[in-house]
């Protein structure tokens, strides 16, 4: 059986740093649900860090962009909501 959430999965980007424990938790949470994501290390890529700053107005991580819905911090409920109510 095909899971329609997989077919219609929104683009997911996780802005993170290697030393951030909440970033690790967020990425693990997505992986456990079979959600593919683009992992952006903002400590190593300043242009992507600026992109994150432009989207959020702040430099804290993790930041998740799920189909255009931005979530600051690791918030399971917000992640689930964004995945279920994708654009």
Where are these regions (language model features)?
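Glycine-/small-residue-rich active-site loops that bind phosphorylated ligands and cofactors
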Residues: 21, 44, 71
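Major-groove DNA-recognition helix of helix-turn-helix-type DNA-binding domains
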Residues: 54-60
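Local sequence-structure signature of Cys/Sec-based thiol-disulfide redox active-site neighborhoods
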Residues: 2-36
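A short, hydrophobic beta-strand/beta-hairpin element that forms part of a small beta-sheet core
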Residues: 62-72
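Thiol-/selenol-based redox modules, centered on thioredoxin-like
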Residues: 79-87
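Thiol-based oxidoreductase modules, predominantly thioredoxin-like and allied folds used
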Residues: 36-48, 58
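Short alpha-helical
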Residues: 21, 47, 78
């Amino acid at each position: 059986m095909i899971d329609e959430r997989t077919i219609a999965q929104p683009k997911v980007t996780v802005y993170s740093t290697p030393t951030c424990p909440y970033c690790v938790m967020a990425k693990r949470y997505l992986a456990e649900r079979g959600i593919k994501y683009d992992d952006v290390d903002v400590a190593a890529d300043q242009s992507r860090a600026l992109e994150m700053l432009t989207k959020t107005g702040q430099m804290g991580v993790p930041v998740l962009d799920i189909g255009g819905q931005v979530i600051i911090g690791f918030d399971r409920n917000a992640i689930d909501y964004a995945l279920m109510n994708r654009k």
